[in-house]
Amino acid sequence: MSDRVITNLNTYATMAFPKALEIARTKKHISLILDKKGSVLSIGCNEMRTHPEAAKIGYRYNEVHSELDALLRLDKRMRNGRDFILLNYRFNRFGDFRISRPCAKCMPWCTAIFKEIIYTTRNGYEIISGQRDYTDSIVLSIDQFNMKTIMGTNGKATH
């Protein structure tokens, strides 16, 4: 994994948080797809809309999860890339991290597509090495931070 991605996890969070504020639900999931250099290629969020791919995967109510939304927003010519990283964020209404591990329906296809999957926990982040058995996970010890400390509730950076 790129050191640039690891050192910029909180920067990516500041990109995800304003998008999370737009979601009316209490559980605000945001997914970013990055290339191996750490450039953001696509951003997705949980959507109440339906999609044929969601039905194929077997999501309840055929509703699109953030991981699938980010993949669908990715240019079709790029979807076969093997060095992509999935970053999953979940925030509560106070801007705190919550567990955003891909669900049982998302995990098999995510581990097949993404080289690494990084998701938030209450204590920071966890990394799953993709493109293999998803039970092998590596905990990344990065202290949790509250988005309110770096962003105002209006979604604009405070410093």
Tell what function each PLM region has:
Residues 1-159:
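Zinc-dependent deaminase catalytic domain
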